[in-house]
Each structure stands twice: as structure tokens, then as C-alpha cells.
Amino acid sequence: MLFLVHMIVQIPPDADKAFTDALKAEEKAFSQQLQRDGKWRHLWRVVGEYANYSVFDVGSNDELHELLSALPLFPYMQISVTPLAQHPSAIVAN
């Protein structure tokens, strides 16, 4: 199942820098492992924002929820999810 996920990160401006740096490092390692595992298929930055659009390939809604809620930055994210389906005019199967 493919899902388009929009993530907006909103870390409080007064958050401890050492804490947020460590959190960002954990987030990077975790997200890169999900990419290597084929679960996080695409990751695109939104220009001028601390946000991204991503495509996840997971087995269920519950699996996606578990992955997203396990992200180290999850408590600081606003997330919206859109389920995707193959378009009949697409020349490449997804």
C-alpha cells in the first residue's frame, strides 16, 4: 500500500540545542534505515520550510501509523496522510 505523507516539523524555538541535535541525528538514522528497507520510497524537501513530502510503501494503515509514531521527531510533527492508488494512465506500474 502506498501513502503520500506530508510532515511539517515544529520544534519549539526555545528547545535545547544539544537535545534537538541528538533528536535530528536519531531521526536521520531511523529514516535512512526505513529507506534502505524499502518502506520509505521517496523523500522530498519542501523549499523554504522544515517539511517534507514522502511516499511510504507499507502493508497496512496500522504499519504506517507504527512507523510514523516511532519517528524521533514525531512529537514535533504535524502529519497528513493520503492513501494512493495506481492511476490507469500511468506508464510505469508502482
Where are these regions (language model features)?
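Conserved, structured core segments of small domains
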Residues: 1-94
